[in-house]
């Protein structure tokens, strides 16, 4: 075709021909200017080609721009055959590897930051997973730190645990054997909360009692499930009156550990003792899958203190008047037996790990928007259906956005400010219409704002606090948006500068909780009264924290997780505005800072966040009636 008399020609064979010639030149060593030395094997190539394929090598070559000869790059931890596969891919775009080489190709692609190959290899490994390879594949993916694949493998394990439990790799895993004392004719509850209690017991044993995980696995541990739903060892039974005094002594002989456990309950009027507050280490604790083997026997695959292991639970009924047996309990255990048609499993994770995300409840669904992970700020928005335990995508935001909060106003979702990954502060905002599934812009803030608190009150949208353009100190600013006039105005400033606060409406007032003034985390709390446009300090929290989440339940505030300047937190506290008092309540199963926290129905959900080591896509739920957090959900079988 010759538009306007000029020649325009595209040779469709040129690229394919040139690529083949380039690869031939590489193999013959012609015009090569880089040598890869992989475990003693030398491979020649062209820097320009490798730099286009591998960001890792691009950085090396770019920093060595003055080199006039052949560059030398050494790798002592890669398989030469796998690197040769990647070289062929770089020159031909074709990826060919035998099945037993795919893991090594994946490792090499991860090292060289060739993400497309890494993803293809990972998906291939998942497609080949079976009962025999499930554990070894999980160990490999866990070592690689690929949480996308790890989620898929864990989902497979949940569906095939009994088959996997018969394989050699599973049988070689370390095992924690627990024998749980039960009243006669009472079975272990078919309830995922039991495993959460087991994790809490192991954590107490290690962190408070100085136990070693290996030592706990050396012998069968006898525990007691109390009538008030606590899982205790013998050293804790002295606090419970359900067992006879002589029986307590018998049990304590089997478990001589000292009991330093204190309930995490305190009010703002008193101090919280250091020994009472458990700081969660930066290690992984999670339940992967569980199955019922027999009437009173359960099998569970878990990660305890970053160790993949098996938990074997056996409930033992105590015979009446049998002095040689475990003591008979004097009160029937009030265990939660699930209906026959119910199924309890770990809640489905989000499709993306997210920290600094916005969450809200909309039409009975949990909405999780934006946030960031190790790679980027996100535009995607996910919707969780509590009844089906399924995450689905809705329309993405127009702007990648993290370090922001989200609110519901007039049945629309509003997001304002935050960071897009390139500029620390955004002034733009947008709203989501669930009927049209469309995001539309809203008038920009009067100034850029990141790490601010957002909530709705009396038909208006409030943006409170945030960080300055340099991200080094908090702001006192408070702006309010009227959706009818589409105008921003100022209201009274905060008493204390705050960024990364938790903000929530309760009782026709706004509470701004914690945050940081500069780098120092705050435990102070302020309350805004719109009638007189004033901020007033109220009782401080027990724990200073920034990046926490907050939700309302039963006329109280629940402040969840966060960061205390040293650790990501799992501890949670509740504020009673009538008594102006804070108290510690049940801790989460995972430490989470910058998580999304939202009330849906009569429960509170914590989604995503950062645990001090990894970005999270997991979800857990708090039941105010039992004061417990759990990663499990209960579904009805169809």
Curated annotation (Swiss-Prot):
Function of the protein: Plays a role in cell division and in the dynamic organization of the actin skeleton as a stabilizer of actin filaments by association with F-actin through Kelch repeats.
One GO biological process term: proteasome-mediated ubiquitin-dependent protein catabolic process
Ranges for region Disordered: 251-273
Compartments where found: Cytoplasm; Cytoplasm, Cytoskeleton; Nucleus
Gene name in the database record: ivns1abp
GO cellular component: Cul3-RING ubiquitin ligase complex; cytoplasm; cytoskeleton; nucleus
Residues covered by the BACK domain: 134-233
Protein name: Influenza virus NS1A-binding protein homolog
Annotated GO MF terms: ubiquitin-like ligase-substrate adaptor activity
InterPro entries to which the protein is assigned, alphabetical: BACK, BTB-kelch_protein, BTB/POZ_dom, Kelch-typ_b-propeller, Kelch_1, SKP1/BTB/POZ_sf
Key words, A-Z: Cytoplasm, Cytoskeleton, Kelch repeat, Nucleus, Repeat
Domain BTB: 32-99
Primary localisation category: cytoplasm
A Pfam family reported for this protein in Swiss-Prot or TrEMBL: Kelch_KLHDC2_KLHL20_DRC7
Keyword field contains Nucleus: yes
Signal peptide (residue range): none
Keyword Nucleus: yes
Kelch repeat feature ranges: 365-411, 412-459, 461-508, 509-555, 557-602, 604-638
């Amino acid at each position: 075709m010759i538009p306007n008399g000029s020649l325009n020609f595209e040779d469709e064979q040129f690229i394919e021909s040139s690529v083949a010639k380039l690869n031939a030149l590489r193999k013959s060593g012609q015009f090569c200017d880089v040598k890869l030395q992989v475990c003693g094997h030398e491979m020649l190539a062209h820097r320009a080609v490798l730099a286009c394929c591998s960001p890792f090598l691009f950085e090396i070559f770019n920093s060595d721009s003055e080199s006039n000869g052949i560059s030398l790059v050494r790798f002592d931890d890669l398989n030469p055959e796998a690197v040769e596969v990647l070289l062929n891919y770089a020159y031909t775009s074709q990826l060919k590897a035998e099945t037993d080489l795919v893991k090594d190709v994946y490792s090499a692609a991860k090292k060289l930051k060739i993400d497309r190959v890494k993803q293809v290899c990972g998906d291939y490994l998942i497609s080949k997973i079976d009962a025999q390879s499930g554990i070894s594949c999980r160990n490999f993916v866990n070592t690689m730190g690929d949480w996308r694949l790890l989620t898929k493998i864990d989902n497979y394990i949940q569906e095939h645990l009994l088959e996997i439990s018969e394989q050699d790799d599973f049988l070689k895993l370390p095992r924690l054997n627990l024998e749980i004392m039960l009243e006669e004719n009472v079975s272990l509850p078919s309830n995922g909360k039991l495993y959460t209690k087991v994790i809490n017991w192991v954590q107490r044993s290690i962190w408070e009692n100085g136990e070693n995980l290996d030592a706990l696995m050396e012998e069968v541990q006898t525990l007691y499930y109390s009538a008030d739903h606590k899982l205790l060892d013998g050293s804790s039974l002295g606090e419970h009156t359900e067992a006879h005094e002589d029986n307590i002594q018998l049990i304590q002989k089997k478990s001589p550990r000292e009991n330093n456990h204190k309930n995490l309950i305190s009010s703002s009027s008193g101090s919280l003792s250091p020994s009472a507050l458990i700081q969660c280490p930066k290690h992984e604790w999670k339940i992967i899958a569980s199955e019922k083997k027999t009437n009173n026997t359960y099998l569970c695959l878990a990660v305890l203190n970053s160790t993949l292991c098996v938990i074997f639970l056996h409930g033992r009924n105590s015979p009446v008047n049998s002095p040689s047996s475990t003591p008979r309990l004097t009160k029937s255990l009030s265990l939660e037996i699930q209906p026959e048609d119910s199924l309890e499993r770990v809640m489905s994770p989000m499709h993306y790990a997210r920290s600094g995300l916005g969450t809200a409840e909309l039409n009975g669904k949990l909405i999780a928007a934006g946030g960031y992970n190790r790679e980027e700020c996100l535009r995607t928005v996910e919707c969780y259906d509590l009844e089906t335990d399924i995450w689905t995508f809705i329309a993405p935001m127009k702007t990648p956005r993290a370090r922001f909060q989200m609110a519901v106003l007039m049945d629309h979702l509003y997001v304002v400010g935050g960071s897009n990954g390139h500029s620390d502060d955004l002034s733009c905002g947008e709203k989501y219409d669930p009927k049209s599934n469309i995001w539309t812009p809203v008038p920009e803030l009067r100034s850029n704002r990141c790490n601010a608190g957002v909530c709705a009150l009396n038909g208006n949208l409030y943006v409170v606090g945030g960080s300055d353009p340099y991200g080094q100190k908090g702001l006192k600013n408070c702006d309010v948006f009227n959706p009818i006039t589409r105008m921003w105005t100022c209201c009274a400033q905060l008493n204390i500068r705050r960024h990364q606060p938790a903000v929530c409406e309760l009782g026709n007032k706004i509470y701004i909780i914690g945050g940081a003034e500069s780098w120092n985390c705050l435990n102070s709390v302020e309350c805004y009264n719109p009638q007189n446009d004033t901020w007033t300090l109220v009782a401080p929290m027990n724990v200073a924290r920034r990046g926490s989440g907050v939700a309302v339940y039963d006329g109280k505030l629940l402040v969840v997780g966060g960061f205390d300047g040293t650790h990501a937190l799992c501890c949670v506290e509740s504020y009673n505005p009538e008594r102006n008092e804070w108290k510690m309540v049940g801790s989460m199963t995972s430490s989470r800072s910058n998580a999304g926290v939202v009330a849906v129905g009569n429960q509170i959900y914590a989604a995503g966040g950062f645990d001090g080591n990894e970005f999270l896509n997991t979800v857990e739920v708090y039941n105010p009636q039992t004061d417990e957090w759990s990663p499990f959900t209960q579904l009805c079988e169809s």
